[in-house]
C-alpha cells in the first residue's frame, strides 16, 4: 500500500487526470513605494487567506495545500481560511492528509465548492467548519466509495483489498459525522456515484449554504 502501488487506491472521476497541472497561471502586478512587484494569482490570493484546490488530489497537491494551511495558521491563528474546491478527487491518503490538517489547525476552514467537488473533493468540502461549508449555485457534488485496483500475487491483492475496505470504513464514518446521516445511509449512498445539486447537498448535510447571486 505504501510502496509505489499506493496510488492504485483512488477516489476520483476517471475522465479527469489527477496529475493535470495548471497552465497559463495569470500574474498580477502591484505598485508600491519601491516600484512594481509581480505575483502569480494564487500567491496573491494566499495573502488574502484564500487557497485553491483546482486539480485532482495527489501527494504533491496535498503537500502544497497542507503547507499553505500551516503557513496561514502561523500568520494568524484566529482568522478564517477559505478553500475553493473544484476537484474530481484523487488519492485517498493524500486527501486525508489535507483533511487531518484542516481539523488540526486553529483557524476555521471555510470550504467553497465551485464547478465540481467529487469524491475526495466532496469529502474535503464536507470537512469544513460547521456553518461555513458553501457552494455556488451551479456547482455539482458527488460522493462514492474509494476506487481500487489490485495486481500481483494473491496475497498482495488480499492486502490491498483489506486496505480499501479500511479506507472505505474510515471515509464513510467521517462523512456520517459531518453530515449527521446514519452510517447505514452513507454506506448505501456511496455504493455508486451519488450526485447532488447544492440544494440537495444542504439537505443531505454535506454543506450548510448555497451562495446566491442577488444581482
Swiss-Prot record:
Keyword Lipoprotein among UniProt keywords: no
GO biological process: protein quality control for misfolded or incompletely synthesized proteins
Alphabetical UniProt keywords: Cytoplasm, Hydrolase, Protease, Serine protease
Catalytic residues in the record: 119 (nucleophile), 144
EC numbers: 3.4.21.92
Pfam families for the chain: CLP_protease
Compartments in which it is found: Cytoplasm
GO molecular function: ATP-dependent peptidase activity; ATPase binding; serine-type endopeptidase activity
InterPro entries: ClpP, ClpP/crotonase-like_dom_sf, ClpP/TepA, ClpP_His_AS, ClpP_Ser_AS
Enzyme class: hydrolase
Cystine pairings recorded for this chain: none
Top-level taxonomic group: Bacteria
Entry GO terms, CC: cytoplasm; endopeptidase Clp complex
Keyword match Nucleotide-binding: no
Catalytic reaction equation(s): Hydrolysis of proteins to small peptides in the presence of ATP and magnesium. alpha-casein is the usual test substrate. In the absence of ATP, only oligopeptides shorter than five residues are hydrolyzed (such as succinyl-Leu-Tyr-|-NHMec, and Leu-Tyr-Leu-|-Tyr-Trp, in which cleavage of the -Tyr-|-Leu- and -Tyr-|-Trp bonds also occurs)
PROSITE patterns: CLP_PROTEASE_HIS (PS00382), CLP_PROTEASE_SER (PS00381)
Subunit structure: Fourteen ClpP subunits assemble into 2 heptameric rings which stack back to back to give a disk-like structure with a central cavity, resembling the structure of eukaryotic proteasomes.
Family: Belongs to the peptidase S14 family.
Task of the protein: Cleaves peptides in various proteins in a process that requires ATP hydrolysis. Has a chymotrypsin-like activity. Plays a major role in the degradation of misfolded proteins.
Protein name: ATP-dependent Clp protease proteolytic subunit 3
Organism from which the protein derives: Prochlorococcus marinus subsp. pastoris (strain CCMP1986 / NIES-2087 / MED4)
Organism ancestry: Bacteria, Bacillati, Cyanobacteriota, Cyanophyceae, Synechococcales
Encoding gene, per UniProt annotation: clpP3
Amino acid at each position: 500500500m505504501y510502496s509505489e502501488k499506493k496510488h492504485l487506491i483512488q477516489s476520483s472521476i476517471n475522465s479527469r487526470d489527477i496529475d493535470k497541472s495548471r497552465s497559463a497561471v495569470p500574474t498580477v502586478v502591484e505598485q508600491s513605494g519601491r516600484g512594481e512587484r509581480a505575483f502569480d494569482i494564487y500567491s496573491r490570493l494566499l495573502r488574502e487567506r484564500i487557497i485553491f484546490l483546482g486539480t485532482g488530489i495527489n501527494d504533491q497537491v496535498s503537500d502544497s495545500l497542507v503547507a499553505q494551511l500551516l503557513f496561514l495558521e502561523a500568520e494568524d491563528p484566529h482568522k478564517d481560511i477559505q478553500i475553493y474546491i473544484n476537484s474530481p478527487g484523487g488519492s485517498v491518503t493524500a486527501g486525508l492528509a489535507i483533511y487531518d490538517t484542516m481539523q488540526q489547525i486553529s483557524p476555521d476552514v471555510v470550504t467553497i465548492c465551485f464547478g465540481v467537488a467529487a469524491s475526495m473533493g466532496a469529502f474535503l468540502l464536507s470537512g469544513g467548519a460547521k456553518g461555513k461549508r458553501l457552494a455556488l449555485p451551479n456547482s455539482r457534488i458527488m460522493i462514492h466509495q474509494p476506487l481500487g485496483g489490485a495486481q500481483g500475487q494473491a496475497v498482495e491483492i488480499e492486502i490491498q483489498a483489506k486496505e480499501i475496505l479500511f479506507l472505505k470504513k474510515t471515509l464513510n464514518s467521517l462523512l456520517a459525522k459531518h453530515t449527521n446521516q446514519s452510517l447505514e445511509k452513507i454506506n448505501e449512498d456511496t455504493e455508486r456515484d451519488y450526485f447532488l445539486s447544492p440544494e440537495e447537498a444542504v439537505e443531505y448535510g454535506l454543506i450548510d449554504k448555497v451562495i446566491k447571486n442577488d444581482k
